């Protein structure tokens, strides 16, 4: 049975004729019948692999999809923090964010708590500048963490390491 045959007519048009004008896109493809691995090709031409846990039929060959959601959120936040610090003329030389998350016990198992811990390295970094950069990312710029904040309690911690 074709995928389009499984959906009512109103959805068939969307599946066969994508809506034009979306500024971001991604195509996810299942990699075969012997597991639960998927490859995602982004609109910018990059490929990311995903796989499921063995207890879910996967082979543990790549991150889980929700791990990539968490990683993407960390990347979004770290990007913002570094950019804000650079624009504030801070001599930042490194930034690492460690994320810890909890998910709901029942489906859809959304994130319910996420903690970000930033380790920012640099020469003479001002604590107020680091705190401000993290705050601006969390409250204004990081679309990923702002979206996840709709279902999860989000907290932040940070430390500065002199480089």
Predicted features and spans:
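Ribosome-associated translation termination/rescue signal centered on the conserved GGQ peptidyl-tRNA hydrolysis loop
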Residues: 78-80
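Alpha-helical metal-binding/catalytic segments enriched in His/Glu/Asp
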Residues: 73-76
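Extended beta-strand/beta-hairpin segments
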Residues: 3, 7, 11-71, 82-163
């Amino acid at each position: 049975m074709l995928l389009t045959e499984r959906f009512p007519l109103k959805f068939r048009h969307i599946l066969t004729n994508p809506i034009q004008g979306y500024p971001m896109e991604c195509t996810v493809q299942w990699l075969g019948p012997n597991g639960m691995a998927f490859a995602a090709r982004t609109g910018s031409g990059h490929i990311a692999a995903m796989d499921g846990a063995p207890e879910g039929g996967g082979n543990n060959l790549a991150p889980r999809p929700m791990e990539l959601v968490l990683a993407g959120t960390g990347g979004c936040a770290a990007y913002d923090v570094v950019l804000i610090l650079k624009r504030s003329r801070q001599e930042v030389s490194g930034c690492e964010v460690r994320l810890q998350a909890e998910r709901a016990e029942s489906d859809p198992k959304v994130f319910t708590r996420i903690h970000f811990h930033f380790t920012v390295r640099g020469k003479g970094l001002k604590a107020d500048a680091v705190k401000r950069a993290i705050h601006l990312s969390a409250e204004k710029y990081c679309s990923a963490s702002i979206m996840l904040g709709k279902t999860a309690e989000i907290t932040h911690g940070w430390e500065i390491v002199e480089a």
